[in-house]
């Protein structure tokens, strides 16, 4: 049996769902690979690049800024699962759109992380300068629980939250509002499987086995809603079964890929946007970074 380390670099469905299904359904074992799932959220690039990673957004930023030659071999979705969640204030109505975040306090990821970069792209497209128009509160996201506490106590007006929760259900529960889904405003082939060929060849049999297992997990997502919702409840334990199913039907089933291949046109536009936001040249093409066509089923 082959072995490989596979690191996730964020929390929630966006990062973990496909690998979780592949593990729990026994697909890794079926494909003859032992996968050690690692928490790489706090790892530096040198440690991360010695195994496979799920975080394609972070891998792309690393390739553009540090020259680490990551390649993506499998893509789960082109719609990042992050949302702008806002509360009403005591003296004025809460923001109703992204443009209304002007002058507000927004909890966000650091600018040179993948979610932080994506957020800044979306804010600029809404006509906002993230450095001048908004009071940004940069924090490590964790499971976003502290963001909910700060929204409750009024120390922030809005937060960029991820998929450790169903934000539309949280908003309904507390009388808050989901201003926007990042995936509606910025598309990028993101989360999947990536490797640095310096350490792991893209055709390494262990990696190919992981890709096959993840492809099978995607088939579950599209063909077995009840099974997928059951797995999603592992991550969304604070929500009812109906809320989890609604979240699946709205954000997961329509947008996760069928077979793990990247849309290179979407990828090209995303690389240009990310490089522009980072202030670096776009030194890699979509075809060079997204090698998913080369990992067709064996």
Roles of regions detected by a PLM:
Residues 10, 183, 262-263:
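Short Gly/Pro-enriched turn/cap motifs at secondary-structure boundaries
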Residues 2-131, 135-138, 147, 157-163, ...:
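Short, glycine-/small- and polar/acidic-enriched structural segments
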Residues 271-298:
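Conserved C-terminal helix/tail region of periplasmic/extracytoplasmic solute-binding proteins
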Residues 59, 146-234:
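Pocket-lining segment of extracytoplasmic ligand-binding domains
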């Amino acid at each position: 049996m082959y072995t490989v380390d596979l690191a996730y670099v964020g929390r929630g469905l966006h990062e973990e769902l496909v690998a979780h299904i592949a593990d729990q359904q026994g697909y890794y074992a079926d494909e003859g690979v032992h996968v050690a799932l690692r928490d790489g959220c706090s790892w530096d690039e040198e440690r991360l690049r010695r195994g496979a990673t799920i975080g394609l957004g972070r891998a792309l930023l690393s390739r553009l800024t540090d020259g680490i030659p990551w390649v993506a071999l499998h893509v789960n979705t082109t719609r990042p699962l992050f949302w702008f969640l806002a509360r009403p204030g005591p003296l004025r109505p809460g923001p109703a759109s992204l443009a209304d975040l002007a002058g507000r306090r927004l909890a966000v990821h650091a600018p040179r992380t993948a979610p932080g970069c994506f957020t800044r792209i979306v804010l600029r497209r809404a006509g906002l300068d993230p450095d001048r128009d908004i009071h940004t509160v940069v924090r490590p996201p964790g499971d976003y629980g502290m963001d909910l506490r700060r929204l409750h106590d009024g120390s922030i007006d809005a937060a960029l939250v991820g998929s450790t929760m169903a934000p539309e259900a949280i908003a309904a529960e507390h009388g808050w509002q989901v201003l926007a889904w990042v995936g509606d405003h910025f598309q990028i082939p993101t989360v999947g499987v990536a490797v640095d060929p310096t350490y792991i060849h893209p055709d390494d049999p262990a990696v190919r086995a992981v890709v096959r297992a993840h492809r099978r997990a995607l088939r579950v997502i599209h063909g077995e809603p009840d099974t997928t919702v059951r797995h999603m409840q592992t991550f969304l334990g604070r929500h009812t079964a109906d809320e989890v199913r609604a979240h699946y039907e709205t954000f997961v089933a329509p947008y996760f890929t069928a077979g793990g291949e990247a849309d290179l046109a979407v990828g090209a536009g995303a690389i240009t946007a990310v490089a522009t936001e980072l202030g670096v040249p776009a030194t890699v093409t979509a075809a060079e970074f997204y090698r998913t066509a080369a990992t067709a089923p064996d």
